[in-house]
Amino acid sequence: MYQEERLVAILDFLKQHNRITTEQICTLLQVSRDTARRDLVKLEEQNAIIRTRGGAILPTVHQKIQSYSGRLKTVSEEKNKIGRLAASLIHDGDRVILDASTTVQACAKHLNAVDCTVITNSINLADVLSDKEGIEIYLLGGKLEKEHRFLYGSSVIEKLSSYHVDKALIGVVGISEHGITIAHEEDGMVKRKMIQQAKQVIALADHSKLGSTSFYQYAELNEIDLLITDRLPNQAFCDLLDRNGVELLVTEQDEGKD
């Protein structure tokens, strides 16, 4: 096997597992430790990995998070499908918490249940639901994060502690063995309280979020009951969900049942 082929194989492994050891490279590619080290040096020179003691990890990519309005303009068909499937799980009479993510807002647009109570910290989502009959809306008051369009702070968290709901639907920026993560600590603290107040926690994430880790962890993986995504994850990620008792729903599989 040529070096270029080995480098591709190493990167493919890292994309699935986030970490690789020198011993794993030797076993996977049937090469010596010296060859494995040279391959890691080459990948490091290309800024493709970060070398660690005994192996390597993928570098963390710090991307600027788009403003809420910018993300709304680029809401993908994948997010719409996830939102539609999530909305089908909200039944007449349910009491639910909906967070301020664009994927959860897609759920709100498809919500057809009646006699529902919705609690949210998103002014945009509350506006979407205000056009729907049969839904009672509680907008949590707090400090407005202008760019990302959510309310946060101690008053939001204190008010949330008074509510006990059937379901909480939470948009996810990162979900991995490191738990559920997000870019903004203020938003994460509110999401953490939302999770604590719900009988069932439903996470919504398109496939690009699976296996990734963002800045602030607000929940352990085993605090999530159900994950809705748009593509079937790799086996390693499915095993991770199984170990943590997380049920998986995939929109493309759901469509196949029609």
From Swiss-Prot:
Residues 3-58 form the HTH deoR-type domain. GO terms for molecular function: cis-regulatory region sequence-specific DNA binding; ligand-modulated transcription factor activity. Residues 20-39 bind DNA. Disulfide bonds: none annotated. Coiled coil: none annotated. It holds the Pfam family HTH_DeoR. The keyword Kinase does not apply. Keywords: DNA-binding, Repressor, Transcription, Transcription regulation. InterPro entries: Carb_Metab_HTH_regulators, DeoR-like_C, DeoR_HTH, NagB/RpiA_transferase-like, Tscrpt_reg_HTH_DeoR_CS, WH-like_DNA-bd_sf, WH_DNA-bd_sf. SUPFAM superfamilies: NagB/RpiA/CoA transferase-like, Winged helix' DNA-binding domain. One of its GO terms (biological process) is regulation of DNA-templated transcription. Plays a role in carbon catabolite repression (CCR). Specifically required for transcriptional repression of the levanase operon by glucose but not by other sugars. This is HTH-type transcriptional repressor GlcR. The gene is glcR.
